[in-house]
Amino acid sequence: MASLNPFDLLGDDAEDPSQLAVALSQKVEKAAAAVQPPKAAKFPTKPAPPSQAVRESRNAPQGGRGGTGGRGGFSRGRGNGGYNRDNRNNDAPGNENGFSGGYRRPSEDADGASRGGSVGGYRVGGGREGPRRGGVANGESGDVERPPRNYDRHSRTGHGTGMKRNGGGRGNWGTTEDDIPPTSEEPTTEVEKSPVAEKQGGEDETPEAKKELTAEEKAQKEAEEAEAREMTLEEYEKILEEKKKALQATKVEERKVDTKVFESMQQLSNKKNTDEEIFIKLGSDKEKRKDATEKAKKSLSINEFLKPADGKRYNGRGGGSRGRGGRGGRGEGGNQRYAKEAAAPAIGDTAQFPSLG
């Protein structure tokens, strides 16, 4: 790719702008003259006769995969002399077998065995190895199958016989919005009631009149309540006496004692103080249980809890040392361990418990 000079336009200042305008106008005139008027539409030509179309299909170059007959089966247009739309009504022998459209006619000099066999002059078997779709090789007659469909190469498993619905969604089933019918606003038949008609049919009272009535009613109620509250002194005293009697009755009821509780009691005499009488309730198990629990409790000193666990062993000073003079010196038996019971700390010792001193 050729490189452009970015500084090429810097030297264009010397040109006359009027000359540039004239040059542009000339270019526009030439372009208008070059435009040609549209040609008249051509009428369709007469189609060629069937015999000529068959000859042209024979002389045409051979196709791609299938050779003379397409992939070894019925020719679909890929091979030489495939299905031709112009030869639908021709006199080819293929129409005698009931197939619509012209199929490739086998060449006269070709051998049927080398082409995999033919049925009624038409290729049914495919490939070099033998016939296809139930055809019989070596020119023997057999049942002829229908021609393949246009979409025969696509797998039809999992597809129903129904037509596809236009639209998106899974499996071309459309979207949820398609099933919802469009809502059309229907004119309402209800007639709005005018406020004037309501006033005529109802009461003619205004809100001011209602307020006045309510004020009068309130005044009457207050007067009746005031009359009910008024009473004489005697009536007031009677009310107070009734209240006092009710209070005294409740107090007396509270002070009453049930004698049923003392039926299981028995009067005994105390040996020490004969003047005092003691009542002991018989058949009470709670006191017996308390006495048993108190007897079970023993007075234990704190020293017993402060002692270490029984059987605990410890090493005294120098227990792990060998001594100074070897085996025969002072350190004889330096490795012996003494099992001693640890003494409990003395509570009175201020060194161990300085806060208690």
Curated annotation (Swiss-Prot):
**Does the keyword section mention Acetylation?**
yes
Q: Which GO terms describe its biological process?
A: regulation of translation
- Which Pfam families does this entry report, sorted A to Z? HABP4_PAI-RBP1, Stm1_N
Q: Which residues carry this modification: N-acetylalanine?
A: 2
Compositional bias annotation for Basic and acidic residues:
143-155, 190-232
Could you tell me which residue ranges the FF domain spans? 239-299
Compartments (UniProt record):
Nucleus; Cytoplasm, Perinuclear region
The cellular component terms of Gene Ontology attached to this UniProt record, alphabetical and capped at eight, are: nucleus; perinuclear region of cytoplasm; plasma membrane; plastid
* Predominant subcellular localization, coarse grouping: nucleus
Q: What are this entry's molecular-function GO terms? A: mRNA binding
What spans are recorded as compositionally biased (Gly residues)? Answer: 63-82, 114-128, 159-172, 316-334
Q: Which segments show compositional bias classed as Low complexity?
A: 31-45
Q: According to the UniProt entry, which residues carry Phosphoserine? A: 355
Q: Which residues lie within the region annotated Disordered?
A: 25-232, 308-357
Tell me, in a sentence or two, what this protein's role is. Answer: Ribosome-binding protein that acts as a regulator of mRNA translation by promoting ribosome inactivation. Binds RNA.
Q: Report the sequence similarity comment from the record.
A: Belongs to the SERBP1-HABP4 family.
Q: What is this protein called?
A: RGG repeats nuclear RNA binding protein C
Q: Which organism is it from?
A: Arabidopsis thaliana (Mouse-ear cress)
Tell me the gene name: RGGC
